[in-house]
């Protein structure tokens, strides 16, 4: 099986062209390739598939084999993948996900894409150096997210988690997220609280991604992310967007914010006119290779 390892702010996935390769037993395949000790190692597996609704379809699997609805960093990386591998010449794409149709804009630089061996250079094609994703409007309806609460929206609501009280804001990008502000995010026991909140199914029936946010200034936030089905990751695009939604709704931050993750800063803008959320940043190809998966397939 041919694959490409890519990362965006340290959020690394194994990307597989499922247009030209036939794949089976996907949950087991995701568990296998994601294993950092016995296989490739990643935050999950992403398939690039054909789509009847958009230019391409993205399927994302977590390391535990569960299928996720959306991931902002993976989405941007898919856009880079299809352009850099010359599956398209378009610089504006619509990609189908379980979380909905997503619009992306690619910013092209000349030359061959780093990390991809190319004998021939296509004049004027270049490679995607930066990718902006329009992931649409944040969904705040508790029934949509879902949150088991008798409230139309779940904003800055007090929730006791183990020995600590958090004030949570919940949002969906096609997958459930919640965010809460803390004093010093670098000193927080993210595994302790993140895992407890993820599995708080009496509040989040489908479990949830968890974003811990530290206020630095109105145009700068810091986060740490606990991803549903994955654990702590050093980058999460939708987590950054969730932090900005929570910050704007509680008047802590502006609509255009740099969000610092462990893997690096991501530019986020919640456009007031369209109500759409935009994230912009690079994605990088780490390497390409083949692996024998005959024991799984």
Each model region followed by its residue ranges:
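Juxtamembrane transmembrane-helix boundary motif
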Residues: 92, 101, 127-161, 165-168, ...
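N-terminal, positively charged, Ser/Thr/Ala/Gly-biased leader segments
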Residues: 1-22, 133, 147-171, 297
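A glycine-rich beta-to-alpha transition motif near the start of alpha/beta enzyme domains, typified by
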Residues: 1-127, 178-297
